[in-house]
Amino acid sequence: MKQEKERILKLVEEGKLTAQEALTLIEKLDSDYKEKEEKITALSVHVHDEEEPFTTAKKESGKPSLGAKLFDWIDSAVKKVKEVDLDLNFGHAYDVQHIFQFKDTDFSSVELQIANGSVNIVPWEDDDIRAECQAKVYRADSQDAARHAFLQHIECEIKGNKFFIRTEKKTMKTNVTLYIPQKEYDKIRVKLFNGPVRGEHLHVKEFSAKTTNGVLSFSYLTAEKAIAETANGQIKLASHSCGTIEAETINGLIDLRGKSESIDVQSFNGNIAINVTESDCRSIYAKTTTGNVELAIPDDLAVKAELKSNLGTLSHELMDVEMLKEKNDTIQKEMMFTSNQAHDQNITVFSESLTGAIKLKYSQR
């Protein structure tokens, strides 16, 4: 936020902004930052609750403000991340390796809930499920005590049609590579407090991956609905085929390259890059506070677009454009236009950034 305020004040010094215009922008930054700070704190507390069942909070209706600035978010969520920086706080650790394997399994849902560590999900052609765990156990007196603590504080089993791994032990860092039978699943949900989540070639109806501190990266994801949320980290989906995608990060890039019908992404301190490869996409909503936005869509869609930025530039490379509204004030840029209206398939695009540039262009197939 400090950098953004300095930028606004510099524009005042250069005579490009009036004092009142600068005050309006600074108030907006402050207001958005308070909202986002409350959300970060709520998220951190939510994840730490060891007694909490594996549930997902219902998303508020409407389009919430993305908040302002994550240069100072260290005062809230990062402070909690430091609490689980195990190597610094807890000293020596014992390495524990363990494999859970279940023969000839039959389940349709996968859930993983881990306090600290990482998750990598890989489908394979075997009917077994195999979880390879590499853990660091802190505050243990011996190797045997560390192994006992690991097995005591991790749950890994199949109940009904659900396979799950769960550990809320904060003095344990558990890295899991999970091999699952290659088939379509009803649900896959992964929730970490501290650590990255990765996967490839997953085929699922409902997919959810959430972490407070870490990258979310998936290739060849096929899902009817996909949700990805992180406070501090990038979100990357490559070669995906999804119905709806919802992605949100506070500090990090959002990069989506693939096929989807509906996209809703928000970042605070990070760029957004979306490349839609097929013509069945019907809507894109992309919002960031301090980052740039670059959107690429197929050239055989009838487009209705609205682009907004306070301090950044707006541009497009579309054909047959009819400009409905255009505003280019010092603290408010706006474009509303249609394009390629002769085509039968339609797409609606909305993108907004407080300080970044926005560009809409055609994707290369």
Curated annotation (Swiss-Prot):
GO terms for cellular component: plasma membrane. Keywords: Coiled coil. InterPro entries: PspC, Toastrack_DUF4097, UCP012569, YvlB_N. Signal peptide: none annotated. Residues 18-46 form a coiled coil. This is Uncharacterized protein YvlB. It comes from Bacillus subtilis (strain 168).
